[in-house]
Amino acid sequence: MVSFKSLLLAASAFTAVLGRPFDSFDGPDVNITDADELLVRRQVTANSEGTHNGYFYSWWSDGGGQVTYTMGAGSRYSVTWKDTGNFVGGKGWNPGTGRTINYGGSFSPQGNGYLAVYGWTRNPLIEYYVVESYGTYNPGSGGQLKGTVTTDGGTYNVYVSTRTNQPSIDGTRTFQQYWSVRTSKRVGGAVTMQNHFNAWAQFGMNLGAHYYQIVATEGNGDFVGTEIWGLARGCRR
């Protein structure tokens, strides 16, 4: 849940992610108009979390603009938005672990948005991101650069930042954010979470008791977003 820098964006700017869900990467594409694929559709309504088709989901929005979160079969989800405040949502697991997450798809943002493995811990209260791709703003750049970690065929810059009196899983709190931001953006491949956790610990960035961990889309901006799909393949739970 990050406040982005203000950007002037063309009215035609858009974001798109297309792909297949975590658990059926090699299966046929699903027609998103099928009624059985569109279980939950929200347009800036109540924030929520729970379980859907065997996966944990979380959805949070600050209530601004127009944003719709749709959950489909298995791990499939989509987000569309226009003129929004901040939102973050996706599907994954509860609790988070050092699992290896394999994913694929396409992601071509032209504004404030990114695709990441996203989660929380308690005691200490930590919000964390492993950012695989992002649009016009590097979401970790407002924090303190701690170093780098090389894993899964790439290098990630590691940042830490502090959020003061901001929304969290435990209400309004002050907490730290941990970031690993891939230097060469990609959509597709493995994310070995344990390697990031180990690197963070070496930089004195300790985690607490894990809450959820999801493949998430986060966005903010005065532009139109088209359909977005988070996906993965062959996940080790």
UniProtKB/Swiss-Prot annotation:
InterPro entries: ConA-like_dom_sf, GH11/12, GH11_AS_1, GH11_dom, Glyco_hydro_11. Glycans are attached at residue 31. Pathway: Glycan degradation; xylan degradation. One of its GO terms (biological process) is xylan catabolic process. PROSITE patterns: GH11_1, GH11_3. Residues 1-19 form the signal peptide. Keywords: Carbohydrate metabolism, Glycoprotein, Glycosidase, Hydrolase, Polysaccharide degradation, Signal, Xylan degradation. Residues 43-231 form the GH11 domain. Pfam families: Glyco_hydro_11. The active site is at residues 127, 218. Coiled coil: none annotated. Its EC number is 3.2.1.8. It catalyses: Endohydrolysis of (1->4)-beta-D-xylosidic linkages in xylans. Endo-1,4-beta-xylanase involved in the hydrolysis of xylan, a major structural heterogeneous polysaccharide found in plant biomass representing the second most abundant polysaccharide in the biosphere, after cellulose. May act as an elicitor of plant defense responses in certain plants but does not exhibit any cell death when transiently expressed in N.benthamiana. This is Ethylene-inducing xylanase 2. It comes from Verticillium dahliae (strain VdLs.17 / ATCC MYA-4575 / FGSC 10137) (Verticillium wilt). The lineage of its organism: Eukaryota, Fungi, Dikarya, Ascomycota, Pezizomycotina.
